[in-house]
């Protein structure tokens, strides 16, 4: 094993190899933190064995070799193509087909985003959960590429749009290890989703997701909805967000439902774009702080108009120079008081 090395065939410095008479496996003999065994890094401790049919796993000190090609870009866990679930023959691809933004390579109708995942949930568990709906192209949990820490959300791309729709209806809102999953369509960024999210108020306090679909579903495809609930009671607060697939659908819903009393409600709905609601809320908050107001007016004999932060600020004072002059005056007066003969003529 070590015959080609210039150390007489012995193990390299820093390692204890297999002994002819039997004994311990090799381990690092360098100094380790107190309380940790020098043989804690034995290859047997990190040797993985496959419990499911799939790619061959070579022993490489804890690293697994996964055969098969991965997709281009966006895979934070690398290419894990051809990992097969024990109860299925469909491949689990945790890195293939990813885009630059990490949203996966599926179309908008098949690619789902899953939020609020348990921190200890694995890709295999996620795959097994969604594979019950239908065949999956890609499935991956987004993690920190250095630490492997889960960010708590994942992307699942189905082979068929009908399966993605059934996954939203069946798995959205289920509880996994005290975490309530949120399953919805993964939306691309940029201008394509602008002006599609609606902010709805004055809804009945007994509103449900199905009733919200009945009210808004006739105007277009709803890709995401969220009914705000009271944190203590869990009951609806009469406020919801509804996101459509196209901005034209959102505008049609605004025109048809704004200031209209739906069935089961006692007051008219207020339906507007969520972006406008956010801007109005921010402007109201700024006005409460007095940061938005009338400009300062000048006038006549120095009569100044008030309001807000009107008028330019005064020019900054040269504080450094003023402090130096003041300090010099202080020292001079103090010196004169301490030495009464300061102004006396010198004696020769």
Curated annotation (Swiss-Prot):
Q: Where is this region: Disordered?
A: 296-317
Give GO terms: molecular function aspect only: mRNA binding
List residues of the RRM domain: 110-188, 196-276
Keywords on record: Nucleus, Repeat, RNA-binding
| Biased composition annotated in UniProt, kind: Gly residues | 296-310
Answer yes or no on keyword Repeat: yes
A GO CC annotation recorded here is: ribonucleoprotein complex
| Pfam families named in the record | RRM_1
| Record-linked InterPro entries | Euk_RNA-bind_prot, Hud_Sxl_RNA, Nucleotide-bd_a/b_plait_sf, RBD_domain_sf, RRM_dom, Sxl
> Could you tell me which NCBIfam families the record lists for this protein?
sex-lethal (TIGR01659)
Free-text function comment from the UniProt entry:
Unknown; apparently not involved in somatic sex determination.
Would you tell me the protein name for this molecule? Sex-lethal homolog
Native species:
Ceratitis capitata
- The organism's lineage? Eukaryota, Metazoa, Ecdysozoa, Arthropoda, Hexapoda
Name of the gene encoding the protein in the UniProt record: SXL
């Amino acid at each position: 094993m070590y015959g080609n090395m210039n150390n007489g065939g012995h193990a390299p410095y820093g390692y204890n190899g297999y002994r002819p008479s039997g004994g311990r496996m090799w381990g690092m003999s360098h100094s380790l933190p107190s309380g940790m065994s020098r043989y804690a890094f034995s290859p047997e401790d990190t040797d993985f064995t496959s419990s499911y049919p799939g790619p061959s796993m070579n022993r490489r000190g804890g690293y697994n070799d996964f055969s098969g090609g991965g997709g281009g870009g966006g895979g934070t866990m690398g290419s894990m193509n051809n990992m097969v679930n024990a109860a299925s023959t469909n491949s689990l691809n945790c890195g293939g087909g990813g885009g630059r933004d990490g949203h996966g390579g599926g179309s908008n109708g098949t690619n789902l985003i899953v939020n609020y995942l348990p921190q200890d949930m694995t890709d295999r568990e996620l795959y097994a959960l969604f594979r019950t709906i239908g065949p999956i192209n890609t499935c991956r949990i987004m993690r920190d590429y250095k630490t492997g820490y889960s960010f708590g959300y994942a992307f699942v791309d189905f082979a068929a749009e009908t399966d993605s729709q059934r996954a939203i209806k069946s798995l959205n809102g289920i509880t996994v290890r005290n975490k309530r999953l949120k399953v919805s369509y993964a939306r691309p960024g940029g201008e394509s989703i602008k002006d599609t999210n609606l902010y709805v108020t004055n809804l009945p306090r007994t509103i449900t997701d199905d009733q919200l679909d009945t009210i808004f579903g006739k105007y277009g495809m709803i890709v995401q909805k969220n009914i705000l609930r009271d944190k203590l009671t869990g009951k609806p607060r009469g406020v919801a967000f509804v996101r459509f697939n196209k901005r034209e659908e959102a505008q049609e819903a605004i025109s048809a439902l704004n200031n209209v009393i739906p069935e089961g409600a006692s007051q008219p709905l207020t339906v507007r774009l969520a972006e406008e609601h956010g801007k109005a809320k921010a402007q109201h908050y700024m006005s409460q702080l007095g940061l938005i107001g009338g400009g300062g007016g000048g006038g006549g004999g120095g009569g100044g108009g008030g309001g807000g932060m009107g008028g330019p600020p005064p020019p900054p004072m040269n504080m450094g120079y003023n402090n130096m002059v003041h300090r010099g005056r202080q020292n001079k007066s103090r010196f004169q008081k301490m030495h009464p003969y300061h102004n006396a003529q010198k004696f020769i």
